[in-house]
């Protein structure tokens, strides 16, 4: 029964949660900055696709481990008329050569990868020396009272939301993986419980 839930319910649930208006608005703040050859980690159902600036990107590739979500993303790409190559795989072991992407886009993905440090190290590896990581992630809140609730809720949340963690630091993890965080804005998302709503977004360059 668990595999049925993970295969059929979790993709639908993630698509619903990640298409909430406050989250979509956050996507619109960073995705248009992508340029050149672009890799999106954890493409999901393709919710970022409408925000890519076609005048800036030369090609778009996406990595997504979930087959149902890959199908959704292909359908979204077809509706948008946007060519994209979506590959199955895990962010911790990217099937790409070193130093080939101008931009890596990572939105609401680091919360659910098995090893965020390895995923970020791989993102750094596949970026060109002058490339950029564009990120928009939810994670560990700065307020102690909120963190207490995040830690209480996280075990149940992980079980029902495809392994999504609530207490992973965002910008600090990116810096620890060998990036120089160039800009980072933060806020609690509106109309979202604080335990799920702490958001950090910006850009980082290989250090």
For each feature predicted by the language model, list its residue ranges.
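Conserved alpha-helix/loop element of class I SAM-dependent methyltransferases that forms part
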Residues: 17-37, 47-51
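A short acidic, Gly/Pro-enriched loop at the edge of an enzyme's catalytic core
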Residues: 92-104
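A short SAM/SAH-binding and catalytic strip from SAM-dependent methyltransferases
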Residues: 102-115
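Short alpha-helix
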Residues: 162-178
């Amino acid at each position: 029964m668990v595999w049925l839930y993970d295969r059929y319910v979790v993709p639908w649930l993630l698509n619903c949660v990640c298409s909430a208006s406050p989250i979509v608005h956050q996507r619109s703040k960073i995705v248009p900055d992508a340029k050149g050859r672009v890799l999106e980690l954890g493409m999901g159902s393709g919710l970022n696709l409408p925000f890519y600036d076609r005048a800036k990107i030369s090609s778009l590739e996406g990595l997504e481990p979930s087959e149902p979500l890959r199908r959704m993303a292909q359908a979204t790409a077809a509706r948008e008329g946007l060519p994209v190559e979506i590959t199955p795989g895990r962010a911790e072991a990217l099937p790409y050569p070193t130093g080939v992407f101008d931009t890596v886009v990572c939105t609401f993905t680091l919360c659910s990868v098995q090893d965020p440090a390895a995923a970020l190290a791989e993102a750094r590896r596949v970026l060109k020396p002058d490339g950029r990581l564009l990120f928009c992630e939810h994670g560990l809140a700065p307020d102690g009272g909120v963190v207490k609730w995040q830690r209480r809720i996280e075990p149940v949340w992980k079980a029902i939301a495809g392994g999504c963690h609530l207490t992973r630091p965002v910008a600090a993890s990116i810096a620890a993986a060998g990036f120089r965080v160039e800009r980072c804005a933060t806020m609690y998302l509106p109309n979202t419980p604080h335990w799920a709503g702490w958001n950090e977004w910006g850009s980082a360059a290989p250090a």
